[in-house]
Amino acid sequence: MDLWQPGKRLLKGNLHAHTTASDGRISIEECIKRYKEHGYDFLAITDHRKRFKGYQDEDILVIPAGEYHRNFVGQAPEHAFHITGVGIEYDIIQDDSFSPQDIVDAIKSAGGFCTLAHPIWSLMTFQQCIDLKNYDAIEIYNTISDVYSGRGYSDLYIDMLASRGIYKKITAVDDAHHYDRDAFVGYIMVQAENNTWEEIHQALKENRFYASQGPQIHRIQVEGAKIIVDASPASCIRLMSNTLSGGRRTFYGEDITHVEYTLPESERYARVEVIDKNGLKAWSNIIVRE
């Protein structure tokens, strides 16, 4: 079984960006222009507590979206819940009476793809990630959280959830605000023939996408317990799973493009990481053992 079919069209997109409609530094028009110039096929403008109603021309699809949040600033411990809704079909009117679960439920009711944004940056606890129900994905990488706060990676929470049988889809995003070093880094590549939200959303549901900072995952094939990976040249390809020791499933070399790994009985799932010579990464979604 191929998780996505080689040779099929892949669309590049960012599911998290801000503009002057909330706390971003550039206008909606300038945001769209810059992502278009950088070769993105689709974009979600996720201003805080505001739904952008969408836009499309021959070069880029801008999906209706917003980011909804509860910030517990000045409390001990200080933390936040930020949750994006992409493809939401109507405005969500949110105030501080909403619990984080209310936000998720509202996004799902509005038909949205619901992502828990930057939980490590937000100083969420792991238990809070468990207690929050029915969200679709977690940002494994968030550019602004990395370059301005040093807390951009949430892979640990993804693995800890998966080891407990809670499998979330994996995205990488920019969450761009300043548009200096916090843009055009984290993105997803989605297999869809047509650049429409309907096809992109279906591909997200079916895990026909991967997250990246630059490396490419050309193919992941699953044959029973065997996982076969083809990728752009890498210095390391590794498979993360629910077991502790990773030596057997970590492959180092110069310009590695192909690895094969058979899951032992003790491993219930795996996800693939491809790391290039510059340390940039690509991440697959979680592959659950049949």
Predicted regions and their residues:
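A metal-dependent hydrolase metal-coordination microenvironment
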Residues: 1-113, 117, 123-133, 139-158, ...
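Short, conserved loop/helix-junction motifs that constitute active-site signature segments
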Residues: 131-132, 163-165
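C-terminal functional module detector
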Residues: 1-10, 165-168, 174-290
